[in-house]
Amino acid sequence: MKKEFEVISRIIQNNKRVLDIGCGDGTLMEYLKRNQHNDVRGLEPQKDLVQKCIAKGLSVIEGDAEKELIQFPKKSFDYVVLSQTLQVFLNPEEVLNQLLRIGKQAIVTIPNFGYWKVRLHLLFKGTMPITKNLPNQWYNTPNLHMCTIQEFVDFCKKKEIKIEKSMCLTNEKISEITNKNMTYKNIFSQLGIFLIQ
């Protein structure tokens, strides 16, 4: 299991209701169900990945989160997980609003467009960077709204979204993001991980 999922699983308590949006092949869901006894559901737009999840015995529906989340009742989950998916939505603000409506808490992870390798690539090559967390060319990327860790934190403050925990991942190492180290983490972190409500 990738390090990001390990961090997410440590945030989520046992025996809780969890919705994983953009759940992929169900790796995180499977772990949360088997090891933490969580009641886990998934929402995934790709039919082949939905079929992989179902083959693992996971409860997943095929659908577009921007259209389907409105159908979930208010506070119907303890946690809603959105892992490296926020940037692909046409309206990420509305998706965040829906996460916070249907979940008591949400865990959002974002690839950090402020990472120093991304900055240098843009500066010296003048082209969109390709990294571990941003593996696509500009013309075939699903990413529409890239942001930095700092921008996400600023957005949450502006919208009065409470950040309960903020961490970052760099080269498989996890560390906490604080007001004092924000500038440093915004430059040297590949991924931001946030627990919000």
Residue ranges with predicted function:
Residues 1-15:
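Conserved alpha-helix/loop element of class I SAM-dependent methyltransferases that forms part
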Residues 25:
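Conserved SAM/SAH-binding loop
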Residues 70-79:
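A short acidic, Gly/Pro-enriched loop at the edge of an enzyme's catalytic core
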Residues 31-68:
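Class I SAM-dependent methyltransferase SAM/SAH-binding core
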